[in-house]
Each structure stands twice: as C-alpha cells, then as structure tokens.
Curated annotation (Swiss-Prot):
Gene Ontology terms: biological process: secondary metabolite biosynthetic process
Upregulation: Expression is positively regulated by the azaterrilone A cluster-specific transcription factor tazR.
Job of this protein: Probable esterase; part of the gene cluster that mediates the biosynthesis of azaterrilone A and other azaphilones, a class of fungal metabolites characterized by a highly oxygenated pyrano-quinone bicyclic core and exhibiting a broad range of bioactivities. The first step of the pathway begins with the non-reducing polyketide synthase tazA that assembles one acetyl-CoA starter unit, five malonyl-CoA units, and catalyzes a series of Claisen condensations, methylation, PT-mediated cyclization, and finally releases the first hexaketide precursor through the R-domain.
Domain of life from the UniProt record: Eukaryota
Catalytic residues as annotated in Swiss-Prot or TrEMBL: 119 (charge relay system), 209 (charge relay system), 236 (charge relay system)
Origin species: Aspergillus terreus (strain NIH 2624 / FGSC A1156)
Any GO MF annotation of the entry: hydrolase activity
Protein name: Probable esterase tazC
Similarity comment: Belongs to the LovG family.
InterPro entries documented for this protein: AB_hydrolase_fold (IPR029058), FSH-like_dom (IPR005645), LovG (IPR050593)
GO CC annotation terms, alphabetical: cytoplasm; nucleus
Length: 265
C-alpha cells in the first residue's frame, strides 16, 4: 500500500545508492549525510541492501563496527563462496528491485535519473550504467531496462562487470562470478574499446586513498574522456566536510541539468 502522508521529496528525481563491500545501506546513508543534505531539494535517495553476506570492510570497523550485518555485491576474495554469473546478477537485481518497490510504497514517484556507489558499490554503479549502454546499442533504447542519465562513482575501481555477458564479453571485462580478471587483457580487445563506458560519469577520488591508482584506472581506461573528476584530500571514505562536499554537489547539479534532468520550479 502506497504511503499517503505528504512528502515534499516524493516527486523528486531519484538516485539509486549502492554501498561498499563489507558495508550496508544504513552505513552508506550515514556516510552520505552531508552530500544528501546539500542535494535534498533536488533529489530523493534510494538505498539498496547488498544481496550477499560479508565480513566488515577494513574501513568500516573503525566507525561502524556495531552497524552490522554487513553485505556485499560481488566476491572480493576466496573467503566468499563461488557463485555462477547468472545467479549473482539475479540476486543483485532482486535487491535493487526490492529497494525500488519499497521506495514506491513510501511515496516516491520520481524517475531514477542517476546511480551512485562507493567502492565496490561504485564498480556496480558503473557496471549498471554500462549494461544500459550495451542494451541500448544492441537491443534498442526501449530494451535498456533503465534510464540513468549519469553515475556518481566514489572511490571506485575497475574492471567493469558485464551484467549481460551474452551481449558483450571480452578480456577487459569481468563477469559477476569473478573476484578479478583471470586472464591477460588482449591488445585486440583494448583497441576495440567495447569495454568503455561512454555515458556520463562523475568520479570522486581521495588523494590519500591507498587504492587511488586503481581508481584512476577505472577513470582513464574504462570511462569516456568526458568523464568528470572531483579530487579531495582524503582517504577511502565519502567526503563529509562542507568544503569537500560542495565541489561534488556543483558537478552533480551541473551534469544533471546537462543530461536533461528536470527539477521542479
């Protein structure tokens, strides 16, 4: 039953939010509180719970140790049980649809115009946008499944995951069952550039993040040269101070307007 309580944010454009590995939606909601505050008049944020059990991530235990249980989207090590790609994608989709349905019941009516993820969630966010791109190219726009205008990738690393391996798969892409690429990337696949996400993305990099070089690989090798970059003097976490958040807010609002997102007057 749909909520009937008046909500000034009900009709706002929606952003799908994907937490990091070894985290959960509650933690990601806390991590993004400053960003959401600045964007609260423009977007409604919908948080998804990862489908798979996980140990807490190394950057989670310091502040959110008691916020479990912890979840993940993909396998990140041999401690995570093997799963076939089809089942993994189905579980991810089920989690996303459940969050969307829950927000509809809570009164949300806006279009899903963007997807935002942190760390492993950023990999998934980019991969969902990539799937939309591939489906539109190979099956037609009506079959793309989503209509995200852009993605916000917080401290994300490649490679992209092919969520539809029957439509596109090469040595530069993972499938959803893998921990990492399991074979060398061929020069032929690199030159064909079928692994490149050309839809708009905003990348947020912490300059003190130990994984910074890997995040730059996602930006430079897997995304369009028109991708936007916001750098800040922080580690592997979401910016929380106003001075660090405002440059990202500016990029999000600017890109939203450029990609046709309509805000209420």
């Amino acid at each position: 039953m749909r909520a009937t309580i008046d909500d000034p944010q009900a009709a706002l454009p929606r952003i799908l939010c994907l937490h990091g590995g070894g985290s959960n939606s509650r933690i990601f909601k806390a991590q993004t509180r400053a960003l959401r505050y600045e964007l609260s008049n423009y977007f409604r944020f919908v948080f998804v719970e990862g489908p798979f059990d996980s140990e807490p991530g190394p950057d989670v235990t310091s502040a959110y140790e008691k916020f479990g249980p912890f979840r993940r989207w993909f396998r990140s090590g041999p401690q995570h049980p093997p799963i076939d790609s089809h089942t993994a994608v189905a579980c991810i989709e089920e989690s996303i649809y459940a969050a969307m349905e829950r927000d509809d019941l809570q009164g949300g009516t806006g279009d899903y115009v963007a997807v935002m993820g942190f760390s492993q969630g950023a990999k998934l966010a980019a991969s969902l946008l990539f799937r939309q791109q591939i489906r539109a190219e190979k099956l037609g726009q009506a079959m793309s499944g989503t209509n995200f205008r852009f993605a916000i990738l917080l401290n994300g690393r490649g490679p992209l995951v092919s969520m539809d391996p029957e439509l596109v798969m090469n040595t530069a892409l993972m499938d959803a069952s893998q921990i990492a690429l399991d074979r060398p990337v061929t020069l032929e696949d690199l030159c064909r550039k079928e692994h490149v996400l050309r839809l708009p993305t905003i990348h947020v990099h912490g300059l003190q993040d130990p994984g910074l070089m890997l995040h730059r690989v996602l930006l430079r090798e897997y995304c369009s040269k028109n991708a936007r970059l916001v750098e800040w003097d922080g580690a592997h976490r979401v910016p929380i101070k106003t001075k660090d958040v405002l440059p990202l807010v500016h990029e999000i609002l600017q890109l939203a307007k450029q990609t046709g997102v309509v805000f209420a007057a």
